[in-house]
């Protein structure tokens, strides 16, 4: 899967640091993704209810708490996410996700999302 597969796909960026959010948003916009940003989990929940994103870039801690409840919601909705956090001990938070430690080049996040989406693609089996 290459970056062209992100063209037109919605990516939710949950990040409360404006410069980090902008940097991530720009990296995804550069490959044609549609970006939605959220600075709190409350606004992220609203965003997920309004439109199911192809994937989520998720900081572990935002202005209104930690990500555990929001991660549960993402799992319930079968929405893949990349945990982008400076926390080193996330006690199981990464069990169903890719963890990209901060600081990270935003292109690494694009690659991580591409990997997640590649793993989720249905496989076609032909019986010839």
Feature roles, as predicted:
Residues 1-12, 93-94, 105-128:
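Non-catalytic signal-transmission and effector/linker regions of two-component phosphorelay proteins
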Residues 15:
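Conserved acidic carboxylate
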Residues 18-36:
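Two-component/phosphorelay signaling modules centered on CheY-like receiver
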Residues 26-28, 47, 73:
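Alpha-helical interaction/dimerization surfaces of two-component signaling modules
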Residues 58-75:
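Conserved phosphotransfer microenvironments
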């Amino acid at each position: 899967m290459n970056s062209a597969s992100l063209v037109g796909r919605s990516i939710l960026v949950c990040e409360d640091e404006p410069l980090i959010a902008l940097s991530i948003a720009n990296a995804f916009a550069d490959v044609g993704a549609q970006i939605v940003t959220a600075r709190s989990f409350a606004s992220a929940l609203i965003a997920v209810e309004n439109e199911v994103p192809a994937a989520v870039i998720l900081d572990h801690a935002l202005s209104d708490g930690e990500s555990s409840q929001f991660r549960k919601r993402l799992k319930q909705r079968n929405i893949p996410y990349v945990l982008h956090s400076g926390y080193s001990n996330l006690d199981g938070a990464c069990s169903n996700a890719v963890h990209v430690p901060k600081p990270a080049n935003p292109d690494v996040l694009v690659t991580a999302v591409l990997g997640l989406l590649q793993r989720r693609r249905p496989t076609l089996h032909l019986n010839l």
